[in-house]
Amino acid sequence: MTERREQRRGFWRENSLTLTFGIAFLVVLALQAVAGHAEFNEQLTVDGLQPLTFGEYLTSSDFAVDVSENWQSEFLQFFLYIFGTVYLVQRGSPESKKVHEAGIEDEQQQRMGDHARSDSPRWAGTKDWRQSLYARSLGTVMGTLFLLSWLAQSIAGTAAYNDQQLRQLEDTVSWAGYVATPDFWNRTLQNWQSELLAVAAMVVLSIYLRQRGSPESKPVGAAHTATGIEG
């Protein structure tokens, strides 16, 4: 019993970052659903229509588009950041590689092929397509998640937009027609600009500010010009 309890504690401790943010995500998503349901029903009441139940709202295009438009911008942020930091640098930022290390680096630095270690992922030690794929897997998956969530946003957005058009006795549009509307790009670009601003702020502020104990910060006593080191 004691050993099992220790194993459980160890699991929570070793995975606390993922678990904390995962639980926080579910809580905030639930709160968004509650708030969105109330707001949507207020609009339906103003339009003289029957309010939706909470279950009906959760399966509606309005809820889907509100969720997916935020997801796609987050995945885009990480996709651009992952690939951008391969070649782009910022002197003094722990978020950047050292200026002279810009680029994909050689196999020895990346522990690939003949330089793979016993604890390296299996595909890192191969010399075929598997190594090439695995060497770009993080950015590829982030890019794929961005495209899928962007597609989900556009499809859900089309349905939500057409529902609104019907309530106003106006013509509906096709998917291609919706993607060309100001509504779609307003939803999309307002999320993109906020994500890009957040990344730029993190890169610049981490040059001069510190957070003791955080790997996202340089050590408190590190010089402002120190690049690519973490606390």
Spans of model-derived segments:
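A structural feature that tracks compact, well-ordered secondary-structure segments
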Residues: 29, 56-57, 61-89, 94, ...
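Short membrane-interface loop/juxtamembrane segments of multi-pass integral membrane proteins
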Residues: 53-60, 112-127, 174-181
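Extramembrane terminal tails and long inter-domain/linker segments of multi-pass membrane proteins
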Residues: 1-9, 92-129, 213-231
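Domain-level detector of nuclease and nuclease-like folds
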Residues: 113-155, 160-161
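Interfacial/capping segments of alpha-helical transmembrane domains
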Residues: 34-52, 157-170
